[in-house]
Structures are given as C-alpha cells and as structure tokens.
UniProtKB/Swiss-Prot annotation:
Its cofactor is pyruvate. This is Aspartate 1-decarboxylase. The gene is panD. It comes from Phocaeicola vulgatus (strain ATCC 8482 / DSM 1447 / JCM 5826 / CCUG 4940 / NBRC 14291 / NCTC 11154) (Bacteroides vulgatus). The active site is at 25 (schiff-base intermediate with substrate), 58 (proton donor). Coiled coil: none annotated.
Length: 116
C-alpha cells in the first residue's frame, strides 16, 4: 500500500513579494530549496499563519541568498507581503518505508528567510 507523507517543510518563512501579474507559482530562494530538499516544479502546499489560507502551487527557483518568498499569479491574492507561511511538500511511499521515513524540516530565521 502506498501512502502520502510529509517530505519537506519550510516552517515559518516571511512572504517578501506577491506578484499578481506573473504566471502562477511560488518563487523560493534556492538556498531554502536546497536546505528543505525541494526542487523546481515540485508541488507544494502553503499555509498562511496570518489569515488561515491554504493552497497549492509549484516551485520556481529564486535567486540564491535573496531570501525570496514570492507568491505569483492567483496565489498572490491569498497572502500579503510580510505574512508568515509554512511551505510543505509530500511524497508517495510504501507504508512500511513511511514508518521510518524522516522528513526534512527547516526553521529559517523568519525576519530575513535565512538558514540559521
């Protein structure tokens, strides 16, 4: 049996931009992506701690070291710059494998979105 489990999590990063006129997605600083074991094009679930919104989109690689967390397209309507969000991705795996799997969870400094 296959189940879906948490694979990666960026816990409490700050939204730096919201670009309604861009073609959808979330742009994430490449340093944060690497730390969380996330890749460009990966589907992510986003939770906004400030307003309770929950939505899905996919990742676009942002400039390394920039601290960028930018919601693009329609998702830009779900957040405000300065909001604190949690970004999660999931993986399908065998039930037995999932029992011992440990997700990558990253707690960046939310003031600057930097790895501490």
């Amino acid at each position: 049996m296959m189940i879906e489990v948490l694979k990666s999590k960026l816990h409490c990063v700050r939204v730096t931009e919201a670009n309604l006129n861009y073609m959808g997605s979330i742009t994430i600083d490449e340093d944060l992506m690497d730390a969380a074991n996330m890749i460009a094009g990966e589907k992510v679930h986003i939770v906004d701690n400030n307003n309770g919104e929950r939505f899905e989109t996919y990742i676009i690689k942002g400039e390394r070291g920039s601290g960028c967390i930018c919601l693009n397209g329609a998702a830009a309507r779900k957040v405000q710059v300065g909001d604190i969000v949690i970004i999660m991705s999931y993986a399908m795996m065998d039930f037995e494998e999932a029992k011992s799997f440990k997700p990558t969870v990253v707690f960046p400094d939310s003031a600057m979105n930097k790895i501490v």
